């Protein structure tokens, strides 16, 4: 039950914005079965999975709702029992009917994975009604994306605002994106800045990055530099790449090839295709570092593997 939020960003030159926000998925919920709580990030022996499956099954039959949620995950993943997605859904449905907010939320996630957006929306709505903030966020995402319901930015914005006020920073971030640059939504840079800042102040790296991008759009390079630096420190690859470009192109700072090289290097190691391409260029020409054509080719290959077609073409003609 290792669940994470995925926010997809689209890079256009130096600007990146979130498009089609993704469903928020919780970590494995609480466990009240003393000495028998599983860590889904670990790998256990088959015998241990079978033992735990038996415990969760017995506890679920005794109306331990938290155990039922774990049992559903065991059926879904085939841990200690034959994989049975239908049984997993059945257990989550019954547990959700008992007003367990975690079950309702996980039920929504399963329906979403099955591309049944309508049923996902209903499950998330119930989780939200039971005061599970991640479910509320997911309802907003579905309205934002038009999943299971007609796209409605106004409703999405209302819910994002509510969860943001409860310091759920993905909500602040997605609301900022709506105000920043979403087709069909009136731009409000002042509000976008405020919301990006709130999420960034809590180390939500992509929010720091987008705020930096917004400042860069307005040619406020000093502010952009500080925010790219923070996001890069939080290991956000494109922020490292953009920070390098400011030093490379002398935007708001003195040109500094060594600093640019350092940040392109970090960007590439964090899997920024653009960072790898620039790093290769620096090695090829000996900019900010010792010339090394062999390394230049290696980083171009990585940029190609990361999907940068331009890098693939250069590798083919490399000499």
Please place each PLM-identified region on the residue numbering.
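Classical Sec-dependent N-terminal signal peptides that target proteins to the secretory pathway
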Residues: 1-21
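N-terminal segments that cap or nucleate solenoid repeat domains
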Residues: 20-74
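Short helix-capping/linker turns of helical repeat alpha-solenoids
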Residues: 28, 32-34, 41-44, 61-64, ...
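Hydrophobic face of amphipathic alpha-helices that form TPR/SEL1-like repeat modules
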Residues: 37-45, 55, 70-77, 91, ...
């Amino acid at each position: 039950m290792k669940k994470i939020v995925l926010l997809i960003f689209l890079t256009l030159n130096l600007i990146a914005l979130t498009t089609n926000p993704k469903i928020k998925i919780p970590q494995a919920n609480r466990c009240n079965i003393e000495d028998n709580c599983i860590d889904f990030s670990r790998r256990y022996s088959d015998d241990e999975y079978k033992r735990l499956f038996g415990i969760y099954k017995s506890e679920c039959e005794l109306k331990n709702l938290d155990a039922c949620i774990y049992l559903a995950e065991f059926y879904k993943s085939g841990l200690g029992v034959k994989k049975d997605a239908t049984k997993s859904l059945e257990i989550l449905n019954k547990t959700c009917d008992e007003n367990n907010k975690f079950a309702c939320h996980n039920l929504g996630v399963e329906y979403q994975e099955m591309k049944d957006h309508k049923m996902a929306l209903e499950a998330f709505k119930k989780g939200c009604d039971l005061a599970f903030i991640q479910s509320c966020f997911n309802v907003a995402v579905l309205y934002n994306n038009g999943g299971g319901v007609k796209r409605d930015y106004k409703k999405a914005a209302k819910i994002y605002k509510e969860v943001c006020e409860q310091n759920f920073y993905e909500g602040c971030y997605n609301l900022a994106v709506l105000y920043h640059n979403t087709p069909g939504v009136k731009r409000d840079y002042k509000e976008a800045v405020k919301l990006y800042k709130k999420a960034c102040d809590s180390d939500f790296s992509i929010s720091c990055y987008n705020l930096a991008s917004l400042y860069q759009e307005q040619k406020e390079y000093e502010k952009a530099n500080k925010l790219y630096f923070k996001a890069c420190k939080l290991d956000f690859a494109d922020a490292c790449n953009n920070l390098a470009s400011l030093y490379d192109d002398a935007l708001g700072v003195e040109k500094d090839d060594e600093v640019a090289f350092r940040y392109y290097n970090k960007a590439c190691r964090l899997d920024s295709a653009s960072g790898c391409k620039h790093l290769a260029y620096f090695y090829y020409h000996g900019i900010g570092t010792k010339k090394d054509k062999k390394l230049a080719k290696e980083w171009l290959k990585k940029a190609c593997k990361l999907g940068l077609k331009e890098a693939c073409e250069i590798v083919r003609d490399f000499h």
